[in-house]
Amino acid sequence: MKKCGKTIAVIGGTGALGSALACRWLLAGHNIVIGSRSQEKAEHAAMRMASKLGRSKVNGYANKEAATLAEIVVLAVPYAAHQETLEEIVESVAGKLVIETTVPLQPPRVARAALPKRGSVGAVTQDFLGESVRVVSALHTVSASHLGDVDHELNGDVLVYGNHKASRQVAIELIKDVGLKAWHAGSIENSAASEAMTSVMIFINKYYGFDGAGIQIISEVDEIES
């Protein structure tokens, strides 16, 4: 466990992916702030998580306050709620690192890639929040159900996008804390690749009957430093 964890707000922390990430980071020694449109819902989620994991460093707040209290903000919200969420937190994230996990899925055709006109959700988020915010886009192709089972040994890689190498590295270290390997994958514009790949993985999982298949980077080199 880490001696001094970071304070991470998970906006959408009551959803499947958000709560799974929050649990993993809490177990890794970080301080977690659950964010939700409903403060009551966030508080209840935090209490359940604390009770389940036997850890006290988790609290719940409405999205704006949750983002204000944290040094790192993670967006794990459905695409339909994405723009509204950005508008809620924009004043609270100035100068901070924001990790964007949102994928532009268009129900019911979630197995078909449908990127925004800007090219990717990651780029939309960076444009909207402004240059003072360091947006990193990641964790698109990770199984929320596998993440949520804290006893499940994860096996997969994560591509990490962003315009600032140091910020990507911070995200990579946090991703390692949940039990996954992560890779620098270039600028925020490149996030389109993983956002589209999510729909591809949904199709593959359904077509072949896989349970949360993901991606893996293969190299002839045994060990590569992130």
Role assignments for model-derived ranges:
Residues 53, 57, 61-97, 103-109:
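Rossmann-like NAD(P)-binding element
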Residues 1-48:
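NAD(P)+-binding Rossmann beta1-loop-alpha1 motif at the extreme N-terminus of oxidoreductases
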Residues 102-145, 149-150:
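Rossmann-fold NAD(P)-binding glycine/threonine-rich loop
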Residues 20, 24, 128, 174:
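Rossmann-fold NAD(P)-dependent oxidoreductase module
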Residues 4-7, 95, 155:
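Phosphate-coordination loops involved in phosphoryl transfer and adenosine-cofactor binding
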Residues 60, 134-138, 183-185:
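General beta-strand structural signal in soluble alpha/beta enzymes
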Residues 156-226:
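Active-site-lining helix/loop region of Rossmann-like oxidoreductase modules
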